[in-house]
Amino acid sequence: MLELREFIREDMDNIDLGYEMLQEHKDAFKAPYAIHGYTLLEDGEIVAMGGVHMLWNKVGEAWIMLGKSAKSKPRTVAKYADLMFDVIVHKNKLNRIQASIAVNDAKAIRFGKWLGFEMEGLMRRYGPDGSDYYRVARVQ
């Protein structure tokens, strides 16, 4: 059975992404920033988590991390993600949430569009490996 709860920083250490995330990236989510997020669990295992880092008044940076088990339930995870962003935007009275999506990640680009994010531009050499990313945003 699926359970949705508020994101806690320790979730970063407990999600099985199917790849190793750099510690400095994990630490960014553990810092005392204003993070509003949720974690989706199934039988105690983290399926996905996501949320918004508050940048300044009415603006935030959206993020999602999918565990290995999310691949077996893409529609369910997508519906939870859409609901999660709606709740966070409403609860925090946000005008804008933005995100970064790797240019070579076609699935993430499609998912972002499905979530209502619109393409705003190309961020050259933005990624940790120097790769290009798109800036996308959902503006109310």
Positions of PLM-derived features:
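A conserved beta-turn-beta hairpin within the catalytic core of GNAT-like acetyltransferases
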Residues: 54-64, 72, 94-95, 132
